[in-house]
Every structure is written in structure tokens, then in C-alpha cells.
Amino acid sequence: MEGIKYIASLVFFFVFLEASKTEPVKHSETYCMFQDKKYRVGEKWHPYLEPYGLVYCVNCICSENGNVLCSRVRCPTLHCLSPVHIPHLCCPRCPDSLPPMNSKVTSKSCEYNGTTYQHGELFIAEGLFQNRQPNQCSQCSCSEGNVYCGLKTCPKLTCAFPVSVPDSCCRVCRGDGELSWEHSDADIFRQPANREARHSYLRSPYDPPPSRQAGGLPRFAGSRSHRGAVIDSQQASGTIVQIVINNKHKHGQVCVSNGKTYSHGESWHPNLRAFGIVECVLCTCNVTKQECKKIHCPNRYPCKYPQKLDGKCCKVCPEEPPSQNFDSKGSFCGEETMPVYEAVLVEDGETARKVALETEKPPQVEVHVWTIRKGILQHFHIEKISKEMFGGLHHFKLVTRTTMNQWKIFAEGEAQLSQMCSSRVCRTELEDLVQVLYLERPEKDHC
């Protein structure tokens, strides 16, 4: 019976939340509103609570004055060694008092991961929530053909050998699950009448004291509904996220994409097996539906040399390196500067380091490629490609701007290193040579 008392507490708290939901009706009409559903006077029902489904241990009735009265079911003391739990019933029964099989109520069963579950049956789902904590577990229930799953936070255990119980995914200490449902009277919770003349909430003499009740209830994010309720992590147990699985489709207050769970309003880039993360497509979880759209990059940028960054779909304008002193015309001490790009690729134990210079005359990009294995230069060559082709190479990053004179110094030193590093290990020589391309600020701003 572990967890049933907690579920009933959730129901009573939810009834209190429902008390704030009222509608103007005529005096001649008397009915009860509960979970956005109308009930006639005298009508009885079991409340519904995700992810547990119908709570058979709580009975609700619509009274003559329009109040919703919910009470816990009082289970009798059984005088048998092995009581049996019956679906659709709160209290267990002794085997000799079970009804015949042909009188069993027929309800829709549920299908989940190749297993069929009967209405009211609880089970554990592994791998449903990817971001669950070590003290959390996924508990599901079957209710009228729908599978309701929730992430439940388990209480801290104070024993060395916890045991499993049939009605909860959380393990408990032996004896903790044997909760007593023996009460002198049923606990009753009232909801104000749904009439034009409003009634304030009246506590029944059977209701538990406020201090006792508040201590065992989770804090809800809002008072409109229990859907999407966020449970305090310090509470003993509770549901953080609900997922409703109807047939083979998942829906509820979350979206599931590529094995990951996203809450309403959360955005992400889809991860396709053949392409990896698609940076230029953005998906957003809209209650239960994934809405994906293509990101359109601007045709013009406020800077002359926008930069492609890893993890970004569109190019961005880089911040100008603070150590350089360019004037408004993109020159350094009267000499024109050109952008320098760099890329480092590692594959099969080889490192390819590329340094590229973009020139206006001629309009091309000169790429110097170094292929290094175990610190020794294996291959060196120079490529000249068009700006259009270079624009499609997203692994290059803008590192600085340099002048043609500095680039010539770099090329001369590069020729010397290509001979020297082909026969011995060169670890810092190329890195030191690249520093030649960085322009130093002249003293007192004089060239």
C-alpha cells in the first residue's frame, strides 16, 4: 500500500485547487465542477490523477448544495494471511471472498513496449526519462487504454536492505510500506458549490488539521491544474514531468525527440543520424507538438568579415582583436590589412593545420596546409581557391588581420620550416611562426 496515502493527499490538494475554478450559472442550476467536468447532484466518481490514473481509494460525490465531497475509502481489517489486490478496487480482499471471474469489469488494456497491461495496473518504465536523477524512477499506470508515466522522486532510505513494493517504482524499507488506512472516520475534503452565490471553503470536521496536511503535500506551480506540476526536490516523493502515451504516440506536457525529453517552450537543434546536429533547423516544444523551422541567415552583415563559429548556423561578426590598431579603412599604419583564417583538423592520427589569407586583388583565398604526424611534417602544400568555395568551409575561424609584408615574412619562414621539420620533431616552431601575422600596436600610436 506504499504510495497510496501520498496519492490520496495529492487528490485532496487538487480538490482544493479546483475550488478556485468557478463559473457563473443560474440559481436553478446546481451541479459540481471537478477537473473541468460537470457532475450532477448525487453523482459519484473516482478522481483522476496523473500518472496514477483513477484513484480508487478516494470517492467523490456531488452534494445537493453543489459541493464536491471527497473521502478516503476505509478498508476493513482482514483476517487472512495473503490478501489479494483487485484491479478497480481500493481495498484488498481475502482469496475466499473474491468475486467470480465472469463478473470482472472489462476495461481497455494498454500496450507498451510489447507488453500488455490491464486497466489499473502499475509498472516501471526504464529509459523513458533521459535526465532523471539517481533517486528518481519512471512509474507508469494503465488507465482506459492510455499509459500515463511520471518521473517520481523517491524518499531517502534509512535501511541497508530496501525492498520493492508492487504499487511503486521506489524501493522502501521493510515496514514502511505497511501504511495503516484505519481511521475513526473518513477524511473528507469539500469543494465550494458551483453556484452564482459563492461559498468560501469550509473545512469539514473530518478534515485533517492544516499543519498535518500541508506537511505531506507537494508544492504546485499553479492552481489551475495539476498537469505539469513541479515537485519540491526536498519532498519525499512526487511527479516532476508527466508523459501520456496513447497507442504508439507520446503526448502530454512534454516532447520527446531522439530519446531526449523537452518541456513546453524549450528549443533544440534536431540530431539526425546521417547528418548529426542540424544547426540550421530549430525545433520548439509547443505543449505536445514539435514545431521545427529552418533558420534564415541575413544576406548582409554589419561587419565586412563575418565569422563561422562551431554550433552556430549563421555567421557572426567577430570582435576586433584588441591588440591590433586598424583605422576605419582596414589598414595598419597606412598599409592595407587582410583577414587571416586558421583551422586545425585531426583525423586518423594526423593533424592538418591550415592558415589562409583572403586577398582582394586577386579576389581569392590562399590556403597553406601542413600535415603533421607524431610531430613530424609529412606534407606541405599551398592551395588557392575562390572566395565562394572558401565560404562553404565552415571549419575555418578568423584569427587576425595582417599586412602583405607580414604575410611574405610568414611565407619565407614557412619555407625554412618545411625543410627543417621534415626530418625532426617540431612542436612549437609553426605556432611561433603564426605569431608573425599578428600586428603589434606601435609605440605611442606612431608607425
UniProtKB/Swiss-Prot annotation:
Q: Which GO terms describe its biological process?
A: AMPA glutamate receptor clustering; BMP signaling pathway; cell differentiation; cell fate determination; embryonic axis specification; excitatory chemical synaptic transmission; eye development; negative regulation of BMP signaling pathway
Q: Does the keyword Acyltransferase apply?
A: no
Subcellular location per the Swiss-Prot or TrEMBL entry: Secreted
Motif segment (Cell attachment site): 174-176
Annotated signal sequence is 1-22
InterPro entries, per database record: CHRDL1/2, CHRDL_1/2_C, VWF_dom
Q: Name one GO molecular function term.
A: BMP binding
* Region listing for Disordered, in residue ranges: 199-219
GO CC annotations, alphabetized: extracellular region; plasma membrane; synapse
> Key word Oxidoreductase present in the record?
no
Q: Which coarse location class describes where this protein primarily resides?
A: secreted
Q: Which domain of life is it from?
A: Eukaryota
Residues forming the VWFC domain are 30-95, 108-174, 253-318
Keyword field: Developmental protein, Differentiation, Glycoprotein, Neurogenesis, Osteogenesis, Repeat, Secreted, Signal
Q: Which residues are glycosylated?
A: N113, N286
Q: What does this protein do?
A: Seems to antagonize the function of BMP4 by binding to it and preventing its interaction with receptors. Alters the fate commitment of neural stem cells from gliogenesis to neurogenesis. Contributes to neuronal differentiation of neural stem cells in the brain by preventing the adoption of a glial fate. May play a crucial role in dorsoventral axis formation. May play a role in embryonic bone formation. Plays a role during anterior segment eye development.
PANTHER family per UniProt: CHORDIN-LIKE PROTEIN 1, VWFC DOMAIN-CONTAINING PROTEIN
Q: What is this protein called?
A: Chordin-like protein 1
Quote the gene name from the UniProt entry.
Answer: Chrdl1
